[in-house]
From Swiss-Prot:
GO terms for cellular component: chromatin; cytoplasm; PcG protein complex; transcription regulator complex. The lineage of its organism: Eukaryota, Metazoa, Chordata, Craniata, Vertebrata. This is Zinc finger protein 383. The gene is ZNF383. It comes from Macaca fascicularis (Crab-eating macaque). Its main location: nucleus. InterPro entries: KRAB, KRAB_dom_sf, Znf_C2H2_sf, Znf_C2H2_type.
Amino acid sequence: MAEGSVMFSDVSIDFSQEEWDCLDPVQRDLYRDVMLENYSNLVSMGLYTPKPQVISLLEQGKEPWMVGRELTRGLCSDLESMCETKLLSLKKEVYEIELCQREIMGLTKHGLEYSSFGDVLEYRSRLAKQLGYPNGHFSQEIFTPEYMPTFIQQTFLTLQQIMNNEDRPFECKKCGKAFSQNSQFIQHQRIHIGEKSYECKECGKFFSCGSHVTRHLKIHTGEKPFECKECGKAFSCSSYLSQHQRIHTGKKPYECKECGKAFSYCSNLIDHQRIHTGEKPYACKVCGKAFTKSSQLFQHVRIHTGEKPYECKECGKAFTQSSKLVQHQRIHTGEKPYECKECGKAFSSGSALTNHQRIHTGEKPYDCKECGKAFTQSSQLRQHQRIHAGEKPFECLECGKAFTQNSQLFQHQRIHTDEKPYECNECGKAFNKCSNLTRHLRIHTGEKPYNCKECGKAFSSGSDLIRHQGIHTNE
């Protein structure tokens, strides 16, 4: 086959808007990388071709789906005219998502000179498999063998076998997925064994795919060429911009068949479905705790490593999660966006509001199996259980005294440092505990919330009431 007879359309795949919407960010990035590389290869080898619309769209970061997609035609004008009325649409159901770009057909000068019709169609089929066209069929319009020149009929029949899953000798024993080439099979196995052979030279982080390294490098360069016209936010990948734009449009194309809940991102739907299945595929190698999301595991591992990458610029305190830093910063700003509709009290975090609302509802969902005592918060239950276990993991390095709670140790350490951060606005007296300041303030307010049920006498502190009750019991 002559070089001049090879066109960009022979080594490309077009998508309708519906098909494009079904691809996730990794698939879209892969498609973009492969298409741009193929066009670059054709140009660099002197094969003149006007810039296709899809390439212009990809370079601008726009969605490249094609309206009124044309049927794919043959590789040479003679074959095209001979077979114009004899098209056969072979519906090919492709396998689930392939995250990594595999060794597709090499677009070298030699390869283009000697590639057959079947070679190019095989390349197109393999690209479709990589993109993992989900839960359906990808239409591949090709010519029937009887109308093809004799020299390519055998190649076409071989291709037809591949496209009908009849020639996939390399099967994965882990998940049953089959591949037509050993190189694809080897690349796929990295998913199961967790092999990451592609290293970022900037930070040393490893990835399982070369395309992932390319995307990761933009973190170091700060490159964000794809900007949202609605709000001006910029992104490193066109697929991230496409996902972001759903915030403005409100589009949620991914719906859970179990409960009907819809999501903007396919990955969010996958995470959500694990609520129904109970699946927790991400386990911590240190303690064995399992999670439904890889991001949850990533955050959890920092407990073991002690890594706290999110630092407050106001006070220098560091956190394992960015969300915790955001909550902490509200201490400095005084922001309390979560308000209780019952009493109007406001909180800096949604979880604090949820815990507070249980005061009104009386809900105590966390029960101690040892004594039956119930608590409004899981953290309170964990602290309580240490009483039964005799566990006191928080030890003072100054005197060796141990405590069941970290907050108790923190308060105790003020005895050694003589720190008294809680000051009375009335008289200026300072205290090392907030509870001590609260009791002291009752001297100024005259408040006595602790009443004796025997005689009605009231006291400003619970300890005073207990001492008083000894009079009635003769203790």
